[in-house]
């Protein structure tokens, strides 16, 4: 059983006899009192979809729920549902657009390393690899000699996400984006 300080985003825990998926974690260190950090977690009930915010002490033990991760590929959009296909047995998994709103801006048909998180056989979350490769569809023209300085410019990617890129990067380039911070990491390997 891990401590609250060891819990990561998209972890499933059992709390008050329900299974919740952790969508967001904020760490705070209270001033003027002894003790450790506090972790405020935004959790969604995997059955009803209801949201709760709960605060835990850093050393509080949280029981993990039984979950399974399956490697998948993004397949298609069906209304408000995003459909992912299991890489091994081709089982389709539907995830609601709202439940994966943060991840949508980082996936396309070519994204590799996606995993669907299943609790009791039902898909509840999508886990991204640490980085994804996306194409720049719009940015200001590249500046000759721009690699000599550390200045950046905004670039709109094929998924609609906007990231800051170095001035020498141009429209049409494929870049690596850090999925946790939504930041430019470098040019993608050709």
Curated annotation (Swiss-Prot):
SMART domains given in the database record: EFP (SM01185), Elong-fact-P_C (SM00841)
GO biological process: peptide biosynthetic process
GO molecular function annotation: translation elongation factor activity
Matches recorded under Gene3D superfamilies: 2.30.30.30, Nucleic acid-binding proteins
Single GO cellular component term: cytoplasm
One Pfam entry name: EFP_N
Family annotation (PANTHER family): ELONGATION FACTOR P (PTHR30053), TRANSLATION ELONGATION FACTOR KOW-LIKE DOMAIN-CONTAINING PROTEIN (PTHR30053:SF14)
Classification via NCBIfam families: PRK00529.1, PRK04542.1, yeiP
Family matches, as HAMAP family: EFP
Family of this protein: Belongs to the elongation factor P family.
Protein's name in the database: Elongation factor P-like protein
Lineage of source species: Bacteria, Pseudomonadati, Pseudomonadota, Gammaproteobacteria, Alteromonadales
